[in-house]
Amino acid sequence: MWAPPAAIMGDGPAKKVGNQAPLQTQALQTASLRDGPAKRAVWVRRRSSEPQEPTESKAAKERPKQEVTKAVVVDLGTGYCKCGFAGLPRPTHKISTMVGKPYMETAKTGDNRKETFVGQELNNTNVHLKLVNPLRHGIIVDWDTVQDIWEYLFRQEMKIAPEEHAVLVSDPPLSPHTNREKYAEMLFEAFNTPAMHIAYQSRLSMYSYGRTSGLVVEVGHGVSYVVPIYEGYPLPSITGRLDYAGSDLTAYLLGLLNSAGNEFTQDQMGIVEDIKKKCCFVALDPTEEKRVPLSEHTIRYVLPDGKEIQLCQERFLCSEMFFKPSLIKSMQLGLHTQTVSCLNKCDIALKRDLMGNILLCGGSTMLSGFPNRLQKELSSMCPNDTPQVNVLPERDSAVWTGGSILASLQGFQPLWVHRFEYEEHGPFFLYRRCF
């Protein structure tokens, strides 16, 4: 039976924690993060198939052998699913959330009854597939496919038995409460995990910075959020959600490239995604950037078929959609405007605290120049304040890293929801531990 480890002293200098802070934050505040994620394993007790050494006591002989297995942290995003063991500084496995489904004609032939192709399976099949994503703007719309993705991650990528590991899952801000109940149902009933916990993505991103308060600005693949957090508590009433993100930038870049004389199709979105990552950047001042001679912006990109194309001003024009969403026909606020809007909804004391703790997260923020541009826009909009944008080198994995830190702290161990508790009390027991 799975059980958390006994308390171990020496996690670092304890800090005073107010009673108002949630247990997740208390666990973080009582641990030193200077040396990276605390490397604490969770225990799983199971009977070993190996022969037991004879012992003097019958009780000792019948006691199951203990093996140390670390908790697994899973961050499911619209673009990628990242997973790995708690205590590590970065995820060890990362696959696309996009999966392949056989077309109906193929499925009816009976030649291949496999219904979902995940990860490397997409490259190792002759079946004609259509690509589908089980998430839409960060929210799960196809739980069966998510289960297929996790089955592949656990069995094929990590090569573990999920019934032997506790699992911590990330959940996006403002997601339906039913999300958590569905996660619990899947983990406990389909994977038989001994324990699980669900934590908000924005809170985990903040933990990766070693903070317990901050304004998390997260720009992922399918959705963007601006989330104020005070002493571990997200403030949903003033949280900002923007339904544009990295995938919209890729689609906009495709249009710009075609306007320049190229002929990319929707089926080549993966190539455009690669162009975005390797060639594009965010201009500090787009007006000044346009005055730069075209030859200084022009670079060559080699397509998979060997053909070369040239990119010029598209390299920085595509990212302007984050600051001027009308370019992609969106009526929502720009990222910088939404950030200031959230700050202005806070009271004076909280606003002052959050101004200096603007935490940038998400894969789309990895574009060169993104932090400096956001810093410039915020400083321009808040001349009487001193906004400070903070960045981590690997902020594209901030959610996962925060989960790795949290799940490996000794103070967090009482917050696991055990399978026997779920079976006894039902899904509503989740809300006593996951908040």
From Swiss-Prot:
Gene Ontology BP annotations: acrosome assembly; fertilization; single fertilization; spermatid development
InterPro entries given in the database record: Actin (IPR004000), ACTL7A_N (IPR031769), ATPase_NBD (IPR043129)
Record keywords: Cytoplasm, Cytoskeleton, Differentiation, Fertilization, Golgi apparatus, Nucleus, Spermatogenesis
Matching SUPFAM superfamilies: Actin-like ATPase domain
Pfam families: Actin (PF00022), ACTL7A_N (PF16840)
Region (Required for interaction with TES): 31-51
CDD domains: ASKHA_NBD_ACTL7 (cd10214)
Gene3D superfamilies, sorted: 3.30.420.40, Actin, Chain A, domain 4
Composition-biased stretches (Basic and acidic residues): 47-65
SMART domains named in the record: ACTIN
GO cellular component, one term: acrosomal vesicle
Region (Disordered): 1-20, 29-65
Locations listed in the record: Cytoplasm, Cytoskeleton; Golgi apparatus; Cytoplasm; Nucleus
Role noted for this protein: Essential for normal spermatogenesis and male fertility. Required for normal sperm head morphology, acroplaxome formation, acrosome attachment, and acrosome granule stability. May anchor and stabilize acrosomal adherence to the acroplaxome at least in part by facilitating the presence of F-actin in the subacrosomal space. May play an important role in formation and fusion of Golgi-derived vesicles during acrosome biogenesis.
Similarity field: Belongs to the actin family.
Assembly and binders: Interacts (via N-terminus) with TES (via LIM domain 2). Heterodimer with TES; the heterodimer interacts with ENAH to form a heterotrimer. Interacts with ACTL9. Interacts with CYLC1; the interaction may be relevant for proper acrosome attachment to the nuclear envelope.
Protein name per UniProt: Actin-like protein 7A
Organism in which the protein naturally occurs: Macaca fascicularis
Gene: ACTL7A
